[in-house]
């Protein structure tokens, strides 16, 4: 399931474009997640009041959390699959404190893919999309494995 060097290069190349505007990308990813999958809002106590796209657009807290999410994911992606030290604490908090189901990681992966495709269509062709999809799947699978270690079936 690992990625080739070329695939990692594609992932990190497009990720560089994401990092050029973490706040904008992160905000859009979370808005997309909550709009496409409203049930995910139940896991975020401080965002439960955000019911409309306008409320979400105006939320500085949502924007800040988007930066946090994409910053953490970026740290993991940059490890090119050797992400145990970055992944373990993230999995622990998501399994034991936040109780985020693996399915929700799939949902946010979809949102990430959609936002990148919308914002960077010219740079996110079929090969880059396939590589990113594979990298996000590796992340989710490894999170799911860690969840089990922490006793969370997610």
UniProtKB/Swiss-Prot annotation:
Keywords: Cytoplasm, Heme, Iron, Metal-binding, Muscle protein, Oxidoreductase, Oxygen transport, Transport. It catalyses: Fe(III)-heme b-[protein] + nitric oxide + H2O = Fe(II)-heme b-[protein] + nitrite + 2 H(+); H2O2 + AH2 = A + 2 H2O. Its EC number is 1.7.-.-, 1.11.1.-. O2 binds at residue 65. Belongs to the globin family. Monomeric heme protein which primary function is to store oxygen and facilitate its diffusion within muscle tissues. Reversibly binds oxygen through a pentacoordinated heme iron and enables its timely and efficient release as needed during periods of heightened demand. Depending on the oxidative conditions of tissues and cells, and in addition to its ability to bind oxygen, it also has a nitrite reductase activity whereby it regulates the production of bioactive nitric oxide. One of its GO terms (molecular function) is metal ion binding. GO terms for biological process: removal of superoxide radicals. InterPro entries: Globin (IPR000971), Globin-like_sf (IPR009050), Myoglobin (IPR002335). It holds the Pfam family Globin. Transmembrane segments: none annotated. This is Myoglobin. Heme b binds at residue 94. It is found in: Cytoplasm, Sarcoplasm. Its main location: cytoplasm. Residues 2-148 form the Globin domain. Monomeric. One of its GO terms (cellular component) is sarcoplasm. Nitrite binds at residue 65.
């Amino acid at each position: 399931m690992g990625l080739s060097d070329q695939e990692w290069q594609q992932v990190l190349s497009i990720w560089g474009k994401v990092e050029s505007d973490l706040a904008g990308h992160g905000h859009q990813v979370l808005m997309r997640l909550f709009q496409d999958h409203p049930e995910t809002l139940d896991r975020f106590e401080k965002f439960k009041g955000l019911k409309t796209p306008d409320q979400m657009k105006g939320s500085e807290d949502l924007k800040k959390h988007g930066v946090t999410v994409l910053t953490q994911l970026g740290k993991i992606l940059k490890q090119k699959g050797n992400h145990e030290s970055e992944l373990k604490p993230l999995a622990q908090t998501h399994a034991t404190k936040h109780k985020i189901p693996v399915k929700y990681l799939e949902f946010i992966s979809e949102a990430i893919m959609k936002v990148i495709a919308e914002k960077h269509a010219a740079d996110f062709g079929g090969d880059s999309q396939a590589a990113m999809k594979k990298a996000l799947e590796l992340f989710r699978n490894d999170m799911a494995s860690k969840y089990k270690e922490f006793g969370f079936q997610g």
